[in-house]
Amino acid sequence: MAQQRVLPQSKETLLQSYNKRLKDDVKSIMDNFTEIIKTAKIEDETQVSRATQSEQDNYEMHVRAANIVRAGESLMKLVSDLKQFLILNDFPSVNEAINQRNQQLRSLQEECDKKLIALRDEISIDLYELEEEYYSSSYSLCDSNDLPLCEAYWREDFDMPSPESLSMPLTTATAEQSIATSQSSTPSHPHVNGHGAGPTDHS
């Protein structure tokens, strides 16, 4: 069996005051209502005139009705105070509500994560198929000089000058360039009878 929680002295006193207010208000309603019923009873004639007695009874009924209304308002205020007391001091219920809400949010988070993972897998598959389609169609439908992205990337790496060529002296590079230019500009003469044509003599 769960042990009964021991309330602090202030809370215990507060609950006792709530209990006393409840009993007093209910007793006030019952007493005033009973007196109103008694006042409605027609009594025998007394020394007081009937008109005076009617005014007195009318005033008494108004007062007791006001007391009933006041007691009812006090009970409504007591209900509000009890709700506030339970909300502020019922920590086990508050913790249980918080735990339930946390579990709901965790389950919702797990569901969202599963949906996101499934969506990621579908996108990956579609992306792979699109890449396969793109690379397979680039050879047959495009120009022969067009390369896939990966081959174009590596081709750029091969076409780039090496660090050694960048560090070569300017004179050496110029000399090599001039030799290549002279070789390309010298006309080649066909061999006649197995001998190459020599340079023409000028007189």
UniProtKB/Swiss-Prot annotation:
Keywords: Activator, Coiled coil, Nucleus, Transcription, Transcription regulation. Residues 164-188 have a biased composition (Polar residues). Component of the Mediator complex. It is found in: Nucleus. The lineage of its organism: Eukaryota, Metazoa, Chordata, Craniata, Vertebrata. Residues 164-203 are annotated as: Disordered. Belongs to the Mediator complex subunit 22 family. Its main location: nucleus. GO terms for cellular component: mediator complex. One of its GO terms (molecular function) is transcription coregulator activity. This is Mediator of RNA polymerase II transcription subunit 22. InterPro entries: Med22. Residues 93-123 form a coiled coil. Pfam families: Med22 (PF06179). It comes from Gallus gallus (Chicken). It comes from the Eukaryota. Component of the Mediator complex, a coactivator involved in the regulated transcription of nearly all RNA polymerase II-dependent genes. Mediator functions as a bridge to convey information from gene-specific regulatory proteins to the basal RNA polymerase II transcription machinery. Mediator is recruited to promoters by direct interactions with regulatory proteins and serves as a scaffold for the assembly of a functional preinitiation complex with RNA polymerase II and the general transcription factors. GO terms for biological process: regulation of transcription by RNA polymerase II. The keyword Nucleus applies.
